[in-house]
Amino acid sequence: MMQLLTAGGLEPLTDQVRTPDGSNPKGYFEYEPVKSLAQDQSWLPLARGKVVKVIVQLLQFLPTGLPCQVVLMQRDIDEVLESQATMLGKQLPASQAQTLKATFQRHWEQSRSRLESSPECSLLVVEHRNLLTRPETEITRLIEFFTPQQLKREEMRRVVDPTLYRSRTSGESP
């Protein structure tokens, strides 16, 4: 998503500390201070007008009253767990996977609910699978969401790479 928004013309807030690797060959687009959002929000003014990658577990620590636009990625949790296992080189025991799955789902639902009820926040939910299988539809939604900025449709279209959709729960190809 970060690559897509950047290609569209939005400026990312990133420090490039975490470099591309085999799990994410196009980069991570992370900003280290985000990891401490629960304890330190002093960096938030630097994010004004930029796109910032924030994992769902940390969204609850965005200050109340902060005007923002949030693109919330929805991805099949089994695909997330499979992707993490591949990246880490180990599978979780089934009981741990179930607990993690329930925790992740709870965080995602709580974050969505909080963002939807926040009058100063605009929210767009994008399904990961749809982005890779129907990119044109999702790109149009993103362009409409970020209006009045003029996102570059062609550049966004070019960066969608279905070959990076390696962990999927069904045998379908994107």
Regions found by a protein language model. Give the residues of each.
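PAPS-dependent sulfotransferase catalytic core
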Residues: 1-50, 158-171
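Detector for methionine-enriched segments
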Residues: 1-2, 73, 87, 156
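Proline- and acidic/polar-enriched loop/turn elements at helix boundaries
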Residues: 17-18, 127-128, 154-156
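Amphipathic alpha-helical interaction segments
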Residues: 36-37, 112, 116, 173
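PAPS-dependent sulfotransferase catalytic domain
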Residues: 49-151
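Residue-level marker of intrinsically disordered, low-complexity segments enriched
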Residues: 123, 157-158
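Charge-rich, low-complexity intrinsically disordered segments
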Residues: 152, 170-174
